[in-house]
Design a protein with these regions (language model features):
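Active-site HxH/HxHxD metal-binding segment of metal-dependent hydrolases
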Residues: 41-130
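Metallo-beta-lactamase
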Residues: 42, 130, 137-223
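Short Gly/Pro-enriched turn/cap motifs at secondary-structure boundaries
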Residues: 13-15, 119-122, 142-144
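Short, charged, surface-exposed secondary-structure boundary motifs
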Residues: 20, 96-101, 173-177
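Conserved beta-strand hairpin/beta-sheet module of binuclear metal-dependent hydrolase folds
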Residues: 1-52, 152-168
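Residue-level marker for buried hydrophobic side chains located in beta-strands
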Residues: 35-37, 63, 87, 162-164, ...
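Accessory terminal helices/loops
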Residues: 184-197, 201-298
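Hydrophobic alpha-helical positions that pack around
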Residues: 84, 143, 250
Length: 298
């Protein structure tokens, strides 16, 4: 567990070898106890807060950024720790006040994972709705695109504007239920917030403000290019653009994915080979990732 600012923590950092999302926590220092932002898939990282002197029964609220199981799968275990815990999610993801797997692709990915659907106690209906816990106020910002009911939670402390954004760099594919047009509008909305610290679902903490802004702008470009690639799977220019954007974002595994795939199509691509040479000390490529996305959508 790592302190971000006073009373705000990252409980489970991103680890590419461990499934689930990043988990964040705010100690309200009030009768509202501890507020978790997303819960992940595994209870053990959350249990670790006990080592820092926290009682797990004091987790009284869990704000869920969107309806993908890697962000809420362990919620039933949180309920076992505190039967009075309240869960929060947007109405467009929590259909009939319940979060459960509805996407067949995600169901296949988590076929071996046992979970219980999550009953949502407080449905977020309106953009900019305020949730107040002790002296802490979370503004609920509806950011559809990755899912229809994606929500970012903005927390303003005395010194920083902190955004808990869920899967802001998530893959947004129109043919898989994403909405690229909505996603672009959502990111543009967030760019106007002057965020100091962005607490992301799969990339940890991004700061300062200039870096957070660069990250958001780059991911608009990434998803625009990714959707183009699905339409034109052999377009080497688009593949190279995706590799270059990934390089700027320091997503080196993605660089290898796109360059390796590009070299299958155009074996003599000097640009692709040069990028691979730049990052050859990083993990080997996983070309199946991009191949699978294209196959699923064609």
């Amino acid at each position: 567990m790592k302190n971000i600012v006073d009373n705000v923590y990252i409980v489970k950092p991103y680890d590419p070898n461990v499934p689930g999302c990043c988990v964040y926590m705010v100690d309200t220092r009030s009768d509202d106890g501890l507020v978790m932002i997303d819960a992940g898939l595994d209870i053990e990282p959350i249990r670790a807060i006990a080592k820092e002197g926290y009682d797990l029964k004091d987790i009284k609220h869990c704000l869920i950024t969107h309806g993908h199981i890697d962000h809420y799968g362990v919620c039933s275990k949180l309920k076992e720790l505190n039967k009075d815990i309240k869960f929060y999610a947007h109405k467009l993801d929590a259909i009939d006040n319940v979060l459960k797997i509805r996407d067949p692709n995600i169901a296949q990915m988590y076929a071996d994972y046992k979970y219980e659907p999550v009953k949502i106690n407080r449905i977020i209906k309106d953009d900019n709705e305020i949730l107040k816990f002790g002296t802490y106020e979370f503004k609920c910002i509806h950011i559809p695109g990755h899912t229809p009911g994606s929500v970012a939670y903005l927390l303003e402390t005395e010194s920083k504007r902190i955004l808990f954004g869920g899967d802001l760099p998530g893959v947004v594919i129109n043919k898989q239920g994403g909405n690229l047009e909505a996603y672009v509008k959502s990111i543009q909305k967030l760019l106007n917030l002057n965020i100091d610290i962005m607490c992301e679902g799969h990339e940890n903490i991004i700061e300062p403000a200039k870096k957070a802004s660069k990250f958001l702008r780059a991911y608009i470009q990434f998803n625009e290019q990714l959707n183009k690639l699905i339409e034109y799977p052999s377009d080497t220019k688009v593949l190279l653009n995706l590799a270059l954007i990934s390089y700027d974002l320091e997503f080196y595994e993605n660089v290898l994915d796109f360059c390796t795939y590009l070299l299958e199509i155009e074996p003599n691509s000097i640009d692709a080979q040069q990028l691979i040479d730049k990052i050859k000390e990083f993990n080997p490529s996983k070309i199946d990732w991009i191949k699978n996305i294209i196959q699923q959508n064609n």
